[in-house]
UniProtKB/Swiss-Prot annotation:
Keyword Repressor found: no
A matching Pfam family: Lectin_legB
Gene3D superfamilies to which the protein is assigned, alphabetical: 2.60.120.200, Phosphorylase Kinase, domain 1, Transferase(Phosphotransferase) domain 1
Top enzyme category: transferase
Domain of life: Eukaryota
Residues annotated for ATP binding in this entry: L336, G337, Q338, G339, G340, F341, G342, M343, V344, K357
Subcellular locations according to the entry: Cell membrane
Residues annotated as domain Protein kinase: 330-622
Membrane protein topology class: Single-pass type I membrane protein
Protein name per its UniProtKB record: Probable L-type lectin-domain containing receptor kinase S.5
Family that this chain belongs to: In the C-terminal section; belongs to the protein kinase superfamily. Ser/Thr protein kinase family.
UniProt GO cellular component terms: plasma membrane
Encoding gene (name): LECRKS5
UniProt keyword list: ATP-binding, Cell membrane, Glycoprotein, Kinase, Lectin, Membrane, Nucleotide-binding, Receptor, Serine/threonine-protein kinase, Signal, Transferase, Transmembrane, Transmembrane helix
Length: 652
């Protein structure tokens, strides 16, 4: 960094109008696990079974009971709601699941904004963990909530099945029953809720599916100035309660996005900032000299440091000596496996097990693969994605640190020579497939920028201690933007042979459809226990026909598709259920990319929301260019500069 940059920054500060700064507070929990406890403030609430139990379940409550409990779970970082001249806006969407344990159940759950981290004493029962008999109707309570009430506890309640807006009070400002909408809050079914505040009006939407934003799902909209009831800074989260009437109050997923007000500008701020900028400029200059001297010694790479410092995803930076100590200096006894990009070692850091990937010096694009992993998954949080904990670059060593997966990669369980040793039951395999579909659907549709994995295969699927699947190895992954342009040609083909869609060899393009194809091959692998290059007939056939896909289509044509079942399952499976999964896998492997289902459709089939797509008994011929889809679609693609080479077909 040069002095001129500091002077330019100083000039901008002096000439710009000093205004209130606004930042975006944004987080997304597609599901919950124990590691998320560090991101929440919990008061008598727990993370169990992939959800926040806002009031304890049977095993978690004081004295082993769920009666007469109040609980609270808040996001750890406070949200600045307003300042002298500005009011924040926010949107939040969450999936709740409330199931009664008595008949009727009680009492309810609420989304809240409050400065208080804990529920008031004696706030169980009708008080929903928000207020108690003493603080009810008291402006010092400082709480605004959207309640999902499951019991008519007082005369003002419409019924025991309504949504309401409450301000410092258990008696509602506005309430609407859901009974006329065919929705029962404590049915034990997932409900999706969306709360929107535009600075003037608060609107609430509720639906039994994910299409909550449709206007018909609007429950109520109410004009309210939140700054009149709440302090400048609040927490957002959930509160719930039970009485002698009990229920389980679960939050299964939660996302929040809002404009966070940082405060009002003034001249004091200006005069404090000017000398700081000057000092920072000098420090940056000296720092640049230091980094350059270290770079010459081969210890760091300023280009990599700068690129990672500027990206939104910025996981922890480790020291090389820390990782050497954690892995026993990368000792052979700690080696977990080896893949196309390098070796993986088990380590111990701050009392927890970690996995450290040491990117191979022979990987000619090691820097690109290294940066790709950090920039794509560094800030993703999904229960079916391997969590990236941090990175290190020192002395020409590229190192990535992940959460440790005790059961290793999926391929070592699928491709056992002695099938009788397999411990992957049909239920376990189904859960693996469903978990991976959730991960891929999240990458394609749930992120701010769509992410293509481009290397989906069994060796890139990791298993935790309960055999839950997590997709990993994002060395080839890329973030892409929507574009009205057609696909760009690429210089090289990316992926692993056997998992690559046929059109890839002709156009060299990576798309969501090529990801779906690879996922289809993986589905067939998981069910059959066969590798993608499995050959049934040992004659001279071409690569297109010599594959697990062709073998499955032959079985389907002969009416014996369930014969593909891995002998390791010992015929302990539902044939119709397996047939449905195999047909879905074949649909994903359709030669025409425009005929493959989206991951959203795949997930709906796996969760029983819809039937598998129609699959022809004869495998369609591969024709290029493919027949266009029957609808207009927005194109997602990668440019040539974003392509890497093929990866080796080996496990970690």
């Amino acid at each position: 960094m040069r002095f001129s940059l500091a002077w330019k920054l100083l000039f901008l500060i002096l000439t710009c109008k000093i205004e209130t700064q606004v930042k975006c507070l944004k987080f997304d929990f597609p599901g919950f696990n124990v590691s998320n406890e560090l991101e929440l403030i919990r008061d008598n609430s727990y993370i169990v079974f992939g959800a926040i139990q806002v009031t304890p379940d049977v095993t978690g409550g004081p004295g082993g009971t769920i009666a007469n409990q109040a609980g609270r779970a808040l996001y750890k970082k406070p949200f600045r709601l307003w300042s002298k001249h500005k009011s924040a806006t926010f949107n939040t969407t969450f999936v709740i699941n409330i199931s009664n344990k008595t008949d009727p159940g009680g009492e309810g759950l609420a989304f809240v904004l409050t400065p208080e981290e804990t529920a008031p004493q004696n706030s169980s029962g009708m008080w929903l963990g928000m207020v108690n008999e003493r603080t009810n109707r008291n402006n010092e309570s400082r709480i605004v909530s959207v309640e999902f009430d499951t019991r008519k506890s007082h005369s003002d309640d419409l019924d025991g099945n309504h949504v309401a807006l409450n301000v410092n009070n258990i008696n509602s400002v506005v309430q609407e029953s859901l009974s006329g909408r065919g929705i029962k809050i404590d049915s034990g079914l997932d409900l999706t809720a969306h709360v929107r505040y535009d600075g003037k009006n608060l609107s609430v939407y509720v639906s039994r599916n994910l299409d909550v934003f449709e206007q018909r799902n609007l429950v109520f909209s109410r004009a309210i100035d939140l700054s009149a009831y709440l302090p400048e800074t609040v927490y957002v989260g959930f509160t719930a309660s039970t009485s002698n009437f009990t229920e389980l109050n679960c939050v299964r997923s939660w996302s929040f996005e809002g404009l966070k007000i940082d405060g009002d500008g003034n001249m004091l701020w200006l005069w404090i900032t000017i000398p700081i900028v000057f000092i920072v400029g000098i420090g940056a200059f000296l720092g640049a000299l230091y980094l350059r001297s270290r770079s010459k010694a081969g210890e760091t790479n300023p280009d990599i440091e700068a690129e990672l410092d500027n990206c939104a995803a910025n996981p922890q930076k480790f020291k090389l000596r820390e990782l050497k100590r954690a892995t026993g200096n990368f000792g052979a006894e700690n080696k977990l496996g080896q893949g196309g990009f390098g070796m993986v070692f088990k380590g111990k850091w701050q009392g927890r097990d970690i996995a450290v990937k040491r990117v191979s010096e022979k990987s000619h694009q090691g820097k690109q693969e290294f940066i790709a992993e950090i920039t794509t998954i560094g800030n993703l949080n999904h229960r079916n994605l391997v969590k990236l904990l941090g990175w290190c670059y020192e002395r020409k060593e590229y190192l990535l640190v992940y959460e440790y997966m005790p059961n290793g990669s999926l391929d070592k369980y699928l491709f056992l020579e002695d099938k009788s040793r397999s411990n992957l039951t049909w239920e376990t395999r189904k859960n693996i497939i469903t978990g991976l579909s959730q991960a891929l659907e999240y990458l394609h549709n749930g992120c701010e920028k769509r992410i293509l994995h481009r290397d989906i295969k069994a060796s890139n699927v990791m298993l935790d201690s309960d055999f839950n699947a997590k997709l990993g190895d994002f060395g080839l992954a890329r973030m892409i933007q929507q574009s009205e342009m057609t696909h760009h040609s690429t210089k090289e083909i990316a992926g692993t042979p056997g998992y690559m869609a046929p059109e890839t060899f002709l156009n060299g393009r990576a798309t969501v459809e090529t990801d779906v194809y690879a996922f289809g091959v993986l589905m067939l692998e998981v069910v059959s226990g066969k590798k993608p290059s499995y050959v049934l007939v040992k004659d001279n056939q071409n690569n297109y026909n010599n594959s697990i896909v062709n073998w499955l289509w032959e079985l389907y044509r002969n009416g014996t598709i369930t014969d593909a079942a891995d002998p390791g399952m010992g015929n302990l499976f539902d044939k119709e259920e397996m047939k449905s999964v195999l047909l879905l896998g074949l649909a994903c492997c359709h030669p025409n990319p425009n005929q493959r289902p989206s991951m959203k459709t795949v997930l709906k089939v796996l969760t029983g929301e819809t039937s598998p797509p129609d699959v022809p008994t004869e495998r369609p011929a591969f024709v290029w260019p493919a027949m266009p889809p029957s609808f207009s679609d927005i194109d997602y693609s990668l440019t040539g500069s974003q392509i890497n080479s093929l990866t080796e077909l080996t496990g970690r």
